[in-house]
Every structure is written in C-alpha cells, then in structure tokens.
UniProtKB/Swiss-Prot annotation:
Belongs to the AAA ATPase family. PROSITE patterns: AAA. This is Putative 26S proteasome regulatory subunit homolog MTH_1011. ATP binds at residues 164-171. Keywords: ATP-binding, Nucleotide-binding, Proteasome.
Length: 372
C-alpha cells in the first residue's frame, strides 16, 4: 500500500502557476497516481466505501484493464466501471501530463487518509544562485548524467552530499538543477521519513525510490541528513531511526537498480554524519559563505525587489554583512530593517533601520542547535 505523507510546502514555488505544455494524446503515460475521492453524491441508504489497494499489482491490472486508452490529465477524474460503478478517483500525478494510459503505465493508489507525495516545481535557474561556482561545476556532472543515464551506468554520480552553513543555497541549487533539466525533484526532510509504526519509515523510503524510478530521470533531495544519520557516538539509535537508515543505505547502494535517479543529501554538519552513511556519497560538495563581491550582488538583487527604497550605501552593507549567508542577509538584516521602517511609517529604509537589524541579529545570536 502506497503512503506519501512527506509533502513539503514551498511558498517560493507552490503559489505559482506553471503552464502545461500542449499534450500529445498518443504519448504513453509512464506513471499515474490516483487518490480515492468517492461518489458524485450519496444518500443515507449507502455508505461511502474505504478504498485500500491490498495488492498493488492486482490493482494496477484492474485499473489498466478498464482505463486503457483514457487520457490522464492532472486534476481530472477517472470513474470506476466495474466493482464500484461511478466511484471517482482523482488524478494527482500524471507523467507526462495529458498522456494516454496504456498496458505499460504504472498506476499507484494513495490512501484515503494520506496526503500525496509530489514533486517540487521551480522556475529557479543556476544563474539565480549567486556564487557557489565550485558547486555549480560539480552539479553540471550530475546534469550530464541525468541527460543520458544509460551512458554512465556504473560511473554515474548517483549519491551526492551538499554541506555547508545554513542559508548558503543548497536547496536552491537542487531546485535549479531539476528545473534546468525539466526533471522531477522530490524534496523531503529526513525527519519526516520516520514513521508512526514499525516498518513505516522503511516502506516510505522504498516507495519514494520506486516513484522516483518510475519518473526517471529524477532527483531526490533529502534535507537535514544528520537528523537520521547522526554518528552513533552522539546518539542512542532508536529502532525506528535505524530501520530508516538501513532502508536508505539499501537504496543508495543500488541493490534496486534506480537508474536515472540521483540522491542529494544536505547537511550543515557533515562531520557529525555516521561513517556508514557518509561513505555512500561518492561526491561531497561544499557550500561556502559568500565573499565581498558575491554579497554585493546579493544585496543589489534583494534591494531591487524591496517595497521601500534603501537609503544606505551598498558598499557599506557589504562590509557590515561579512560572514553572513545569503539567507541571513535577506531575512535577518534587510527584512528586519524593512519591517522596522514600515512600523515607523518611514518612506525609506535608512541607516538607523539597518543598525537596528544588525543589533537585533547580534542580540539573538547564531542558533546553537546542531540541526539549525
């Protein structure tokens, strides 16, 4: 039974509308994900059934048999014609969208009480990521692999570790990588892989990789890797965490040949990762704090979009924001200063507002939690 309960809401991409390309009605659907919805209407003489696919293979055969030739468009509905006439299933995911269901289409049924796991879509490009030139160069190797997985085979960069200070662009670069190649990106937090019951976490990992394989080439981005992969010297490993780690190692080892799937793990503290997990990453990519020139580019880009004019020299801001990440500059300096100016009904962000933001940041200090 398939469970996808790791949806990541990303306001940067979730609230945007993405144009759907004109579909080819003869193009074969590789994957269709369905969610049980129910009947168009019910009366007090009948009770809406709970739909659970006890046997996934049998459900796929059953579904393909009655819906072969139907067009699978995301957001549309398919109605059962056999066991439960007129019972509706919503098409949550179709890959590619608007394609035709055939005998070769993989069909997955979500549980009634679970939210679907879905890909994150983004319009971010590598040019939007300021700095991190070394990381970008290494990411182009991943791009070459995803463009032609069959060419690389055993030489593929399948498991890559992004590490560095918070807010340095690890997630942003992964989004740009997937967007430029137009491949699915599955973005999850490691802590969400720990299930409520024994076996839940391992099952979710295997099902995640199954989904990624069926939509390959694709990218799986696991954030906060140290939350589950912490070195055993620093924790008493719980059974539910251990099963998640073992399932993840199985997938990363390639026991199930997930050709065309790249796993990117992200952590702020690579030295705290368990050796068994860290050794599975063939490539480690460091994300560094921006230098003076990079901070200047960031500041100019951010200030250009602010709702109030900034009456403060950019060059001076560059010096005042040394050792800060791009996220710190935007959220903890510029945003705090902007909100202070708005609260005072000021027509611009002035020196005193910048000074207030810098003072607030100094008072609050850096987060001490190792997973921050």
């Amino acid at each position: 039974m398939v469970k996808f309960n790791n949806i990541i809401y990303d306001p940067q991409v979730s609230d945007k509308k993405f144009p759907v390309q004109a579909s080819d009605p003869e193009r074969e659907a590789k994957l269709v994900v369905l969610q049980p919805v129910g009947y168009p209407f019910v009366c007090n003489l009948m009770e809406a059934p709970r739909i659970d696919a006890v046997n996934k293979e049998l459900f796929e055969i059953y579904a393909r048999d009655q819906w072969e030739g139907f067009r699978a468009a995301e957001g549309s509905y398919l109605f059962d014609q056999k066991l439960l006439p007129d019972y509706a299933f919503k098409i949550i995911r179709a890959h590619p969208d608007g394609s035709k269901i055939t005998r070769n289409t993989s069909i997955i049924l979500l549980e009634n009480d679970r939210e679907e796991f879905h890909e994150v879509r983004s319009s971010i490009t590598m040019d939007d990521v300021i700095g991190q030139e070394d990381a970008k160069i290494k990411c182009r190797i991943i791009m070459k692999y995803l463009e032609d997985p069959d060419r690389f085979r055993d030489w593929a960069p399948r498991n890559v570790l992004f590490h560095g200070s918070p807010g340095t662009g690890k997630t942003m670069l992964a989004k740009s990588l997937a967007n430029e190649l137009k491949v699915p990106l599955y973005l999850i937090k490691a802590t969400s892989l720990i299930g409520e019951h024994v076996g839940d976490g391992a099952r979710q990992i295997h099902e995640l990789y199954e989904l990624a394989s069926k939509t390959a080439p694709s990218v799986i981005f696991i954030d906060e890797m140290d939350a589950i992969g912490l070195d055993r010297r620093y924790q008493s490993l719980r059974g539910d965490v251990s099963e998640v780690v073992n399932a993840l190692l199985t997938e990363m080892d390639g026991i199930n040949q997930n050709w065309g799937v790249v796993t990117i793990g992200a952590t702020n503290n690579p030295e705290l990762l368990d050796k068994a997990i860290r050794s599975r990453f063939e490539e480690e990519i460091e994300f560094k704090l921006p230098d003076d020139e990079e901070r200047k580019l960031m500041l100019e880009k951010y200030i250009e979009t602010m709702p109030l004019k900034v009456d403060f020299p950019v060059d001076k801001l560059v010096k005042l924001t040394r050792e800060m990440s791009g996220r710190d500059i935007k959220d903890r300096v510029l945003k705090t200063a902007l909100h202070r100016a708005i609260a005072e009904d000021s027509e611009s962000v002035r020196a005193e507002h910048i000074e207030y933001a810098l003072k607030e940041r100094k008072v609050s200090g850096e987060p001490k939690h190792m997973f921050a």
